[in-house]
Amino acid sequence: MGEHRRRLLALAGPVYAELLAGVAAGIINTVWVARLGGDAVAAVAVATNVENVLLGVVLVAGSGTTVLLARARGAGDAEAMRGAVRGGWVLWALVTPLVAIGGYAGRAPLAALVLGGGADPGALALTRAYFALALPGIAVLFASNVVGGVLKGLGDTRTPMRLSLLANGLILALDPLLVLALHLGVRGAALSTVLGRSVALLCGLVLLRRRLPRGKGWLAGGGLVADARGVAATGLPMSADFVIRMAGTLALVGVVARIGVAEVAAYGIATKALYVATMSFYAVRQATAIHTAHLIGAGREERAAVGREALRLSGGIAVLASAFLLAAGPWIVGGLGAGGAVAVAGTLYLRCVGPYLLLLACYIALGGVFEGSGRAAVLVRLTAYGQVLQLALAYALSGYGLPGVCLAMALATALPCAAAARLHRGLDPAVTRPS
């Protein structure tokens, strides 16, 4: 096994576990509030979706810090390392009040927006109650993302994973107490989430303080605006790419709705099942970005080799996942609670989605090389074009049912994937050292 593959596996494994833990938090809350009725489940479900979208905002700070810190670490540039850490925290301080305070103030119209017109008054009230705690608590999630970004930039992906598992363990322990025993309902679910993440954040800050080299200037010093601007310039394309892809997934629901109600339900259930696979692609992408940035900082031009290993790793995972979905589709959708026409449609979707998964895996893996090289902006354009094309093709092919939608997804992903592969082959071998 080559050096690059070993390093990618070592970095990606913990990142994958961390991403799975993030999804598990919403599942834990849903399981406990399910005993309170459908309105409570709807409130927690839509609030979790909102949180996922908001997470894309703070990726500007977390991802930007990771890449700049990894590059500076590779170059042995202590001042650039300090600047990356400062820039990440400055962005957190700027963005968090806008989201937390603004979200709390606008929780009522936000609840109405995400639940849609004609929503049940009970569900609206419960969603507002959940947002009243969860949106101010987003400050904790944002801070945890920055802590994780710093640790990953230092080459440590295991500690963020452990912190996520700690938070989930606390949520699992607190949910039955707060939701049921103390009769706090959805407020209890929101409170347990904030408390669990807060404890994990405090532990992360303590560990981070020990990991950062001793010396002045890590969290204070001159040039704060320049530091923040550098992190934002690096992280913004990654954040935009995430948000565009999330928006495209949501928009595709409207196209699927033209096919039928069972197909919409099947698409929603199958998409959740696909998260297990797609999160592994994003884990490889993060690992590739960290490794690439570190190599560039060290003056080693090996982006082509790293990209090839990332393609092999992510593509291999996609092939295995596609084969598993093809064989186990009925059991997967059944295990997620689907039955009848929904189960049939969900199984068909999972059996047709394999080519899309493989192309997506390759595109996401190559994205890590561009992120680590500071050229992620090109990915934003490719992703945006791909999402627009996906919607147009899905609309045109919706007459063929879910197989037509899967074909549209594959075709729309093939074009940006081919463009990314061509750009990867033509990467300038000259190494740009961080200034």
What do these predicted ranges mean?
Residues 1-15, 69-137, 181-236, 292-356, ...:
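Short alpha-helical transmembrane segments in multi-pass integral membrane proteins
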Residues 10-29, 133, 144, 167, ...:
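Transmembrane helical elements of multi-pass membrane transporters/channels
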Residues 24-42, 111-121, 177-184, 239, ...:
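Helix-terminus/linker motif at the lipid-water interface of multi-pass membrane proteins
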Residues 15, 19, 27-31, 48, ...:
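Transmembrane alpha-helix boundary and packing residues in multipass membrane permease domains
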Residues 41-101, 141-160, 264-329, 362-374, ...:
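Small-residue-rich hydrophobic transmembrane alpha-helices
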Residues 34, 71-74, 153, 182, ...:
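Membrane-helix boundary and inter-helical linker elements of multi-pass secondary transporters
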Residues 62, 133-152, 160-171, 189-205, ...:
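Short runs within selected transmembrane alpha-helices of multi-pass transporters and secretion channels
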Residues 3-31, 35-36, 49-64, 68, ...:
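N-terminal transmembrane alpha-helices
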